[in-house]
Amino acid sequence: MPISLEYLGPAQAPASVGDFYFLRHGKTDLNEKEVFVQGEKHWGVQGAGTNIGLNETGKRQAVLAGNVLRKLPISSVVCSPLLRAIQTAVIANIGCLCFEIDDDLKERDFGKHEGGYGPLKMFEENYPDTENTELFSMRVAKALAHAETENTLFVSHGGVLRVVAALLGVELTKEHTDNGRVLHFRRGCPQWTVEIHQSPVILISGPSRGIGKAIAENLIAHGYRMSLGARRVKDLESAFGPQSEWLHYARFDAEDNDTMAAWVTAAVEKFGRIDGLINNAGCGEPVNLEKDIDYKQFHRQWHINCVAPLRMTELCLPYLCETGSGRVVNINSMSGQRVLNPFVGYNMTKHALGGLTKTTQHVGWDRGVRAIDICPGFVATEMSAWTDLISSNDMIQPNDIANLVREAIERPNRAYVPRSEVMCMKESIH
């Protein structure tokens, strides 16, 4: 429900305000509390007089917001002095050197009602023992003057956000007012607009263990929203905990194309977009040219290492093109660049995977899609346990690959690297 003119009183936005960003703090326990009193819904009351920190959900929301904000041209950060706002700004790790606290960005003061529950009218109008709405609106308008410097970021509260929007004549939806949302207010002609910025959505196949698990953990820690596909969803729950608004699980069988289509459909239904695909699932079974070849085993390896990445790329490509900066990361191998053994199945399929990467790059380039082969040598996982050429301590570690994957996702379109060869032992350069 929009704030009324009566609520605002004489408050007006400064005339010289430029485009700016707004981040509502992450959730606290009070944000999640509701009760019914005589059939009327009451919400948890936390205003200027309630100085509590974020709960675990709120901390995660701050991490997600940070992923977005670090890519935006933030010129300065102006923050409410309340703990929940400061925690949000710190956890988001925005990386802006200009940081300021402004008391005028505090939430409205709800007096003796702080920490309890209140009806809707407490938040919508002047209510006994609460801060006068006109005075509240006037101090918010005063704080808004910081946006005379373009691309200022305000880190504040829901009530402050609603006043800001009302001062600028912008209508907010529930999605705009959710905790942890990054909003971009733009001065248009003739009116202001507001846009939501959310962290990218990345799909990873085979993330239950090894390299895939390290990649998923790394991206989650850096504020990406994730859709994870594995044969057994319970393995994902064991590895990453329950699903949430930013974490999605799906059944993925690299030998069953139907599971791939269902996964992509479910991910889009949940998040509304796909920004990146990481084809990680692979098969390293030793199909040996020096022995009788098991062609059933070879065809299985071909399907897992080549057909499944192709199908996933085909399914995701339309959504990746929509973003203007879609990413496809194929976890390849140095075995896709050179040959050191008779394992013809693995060597062939990894060379073929490189062909998929190049074709994806060719097809998607003009729509902003970039594809990369990440080609490690021996990685300290179960797949490399057979070799005695190098000790596990001297092998590439899974998180080394995870860091390279994240760098590939975040690298700009204008300076893309299509292949990364990762070595842990002396080899000739091809």
From Swiss-Prot:
Q: Which biological pathway?
A: Opine metabolism; mannopine biosynthesis
Q: Which cysteines are joined by disulfide bonds?
A: none
Name the EC number(s).
1.-.-.-
Active site: residue positions: 346
Question: What residues bind NAD(+), as annotated?
Answer: 203-227
GO MF: oxidoreductase activity
Extract the SUPFAM superfamilies matched here.
Answer: NAD(P)-binding Rossmann-fold domains, Phosphoglycerate mutase-like
**Which sites bind substrate?**
333
Q: Which InterPro entries match?
A: His_Pase_superF_clade-1, His_PPase_superfam, Mas1, NAD(P)-bd_dom_sf, Sc_DH/Rdtase_CS, SDR_fam
Keyword ATP-binding set for record = no
Instruction: Cite the entry's keywords alphabetically.
Output: Oxidoreductase, Plasmid
Q: Which Pfam families match?
A: adh_short, His_Phos_1
Tell me which family the UniProt entry assigns to this protein.
Belongs to the short-chain dehydrogenases/reductases (SDR) family.
Q: What does this protein do?
A: Reduces deoxy-fructosyl-glutamine to mannopine.
Q: Which PANTHER family match?
A: EG:BACR7A4.14 PROTEIN-RELATED (PTHR43975:SF2), ZGC:101858 (PTHR43975)
Provide the protein name.
Answer: Agropine synthesis reductase
Q: Where does this protein come from, organism-wise?
A: Rhizobium rhizogenes (Agrobacterium rhizogenes)
The encoding gene is: mas1
